[in-house]
Amino acid sequence: MNGEAKRTRLDQRRAPIHEALENFRRMRVVPFDVPGHKRGRGNPELTAFLGQQCVGVDVNSMKPLDNLCHPVSVIREAEELAADAFGAAHAFLMVGGTTSSVQSMVLTACKRGDEIILPRNVHRSVLNALVLCGAVPVYVNPEVDNRLGISLGMKREQVAKAIAEHPNAVAVLVNNPTYYGICSDLRAIVKMAHEAGMLCLADEAHGTHFYFGNGLPVSAMAAGADMASVSMHKSGGSLTQSSLLLIGPNVHQGYVRQIINLTQTTSGSYLLMSSLDISRRNLALRGRQVFHQVADMAEYAREEINAVGGYYAFGKELCNGDSVFDFDTTKLSVHTLDIGLAGIEVYDILRDEYDIQIEFGDIGNILAYLSIGDRPQEIERLVSALAEIKRRYHTDGTGLLSQEYIDPVVAASPQEAFYAPKKSLPLRETEGMVCSEFVMCYPPGIPILAPGERITKEILNYIEYAKAKGCSMTGPEDPDILHLNVLA
């Protein structure tokens, strides 16, 4: 292919799925296929709610629109454009959220009995994948910031030690960044993994903007990682549940497609795919400018919130060259314990009394997620609300827990524990037993307990405290979490 043809094919102004849907809309095709709402005519209430523009392109795979399971035309073009925009060898459009991207990434790298090196503060989707494939986690317990009570990144020395002690591990997985914006030394970890013959996988659910930002942490593809799961819907502007799976040149594209097709729907949503296509175009053309503005807004918010007093909106000052190698300056994470309120309490007050919905609140912190749709006036409203909350609710904070992360005691693999014979016991009677299910606050979706981990008094205290403070707890069969399933 000559250079001119290549430039035309990779013209980032194009959005081939979007263009194909617009052409299809003009064709006025009579539908005798699914979906059964028939362009909205069969469900007028849905059409009134979502709009004709939306339901009119909620269509099934067909020749002019390609097929997500085996793309050969417009979806293939959209994937090539995404790969070009993100600096990847190939990109896969994912419609099962970044959960499906992460699981496909782990299932590609690991088989039953394989070891994978990873931090324990991973999203539940990583551990779910281990339940499915039977791989065995080798945890690198992250450093903890004792003031903030949050887990940090993996230290280079810890990763090197894990690789040396587990030379047959097949991969190292890295959060880039964590929910709080903390980044490990990704380039160094990639180098260590590759020198040991291992893949390096990156969970970039919260790092889409790294590919389009000046002064932001390094992206996984730029660092040489082999695979990366990217939540376009979080900071990239696409619809919820849409995601990208990026791979480097040393990963077999065809095999990854087979892995994806094991679990991803055969009825890919064109609403989600076109949103990925349009959002990729937007980021490729305007992303650097937009995310520079987002970082500026976040920095302004940090300064204003810290000026209120009592709160600590943290940033790059946490960087220490290792466990906090870099920090995502678009993240607005705020420590709340010094005003005497848990993060989840501030979260609830903001929503219930000020009509401000932030991303999450945990034991000691809140996160306000800033991205391409935010404006300065919303920042001012958030800062004013936090100042008023401090004035109205400030207390001495006696009895507040401060630690968000508890080192696990692993007694069995996730798959072994999940499928083993089990029994249900009252919460306080489970101390010392091995858990067979997940327990987590969502968001952020990082398990407090995972299958195969021993239940300690410290963990039980944390669960009861989080419940009492109003954290949304998920995972166990018992929705009230009065009982837990343990190995029989």
Describe every region a protein language model picked out.
Residues 300-475:
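Conserved C-terminal alpha-helix-loop-beta "cap" of PLP-dependent enzymes
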Residues 1-73, 444:
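N-terminal "arm"/small-domain region of PLP-dependent enzymes with the aminotransferase-like
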Residues 90-116, 129:
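Conserved beta-loop-alpha segment that forms the PLP phosphate-binding cup at the N-terminus of a helix
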Residues 55-97:
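Conserved N-terminal alpha-helix of the aminotransferase class I/II PLP-enzyme fold
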Residues 148-209:
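Active-site phosphate-binding strand-loop segment of PLP-dependent enzymes
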Residues 219-258, 264-275:
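Active-site PLP attachment segment
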Residues 279-302, 378:
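Structural signature of PLP-dependent enzymes
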Residues 113-174:
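PLP-dependent aminotransferase-like
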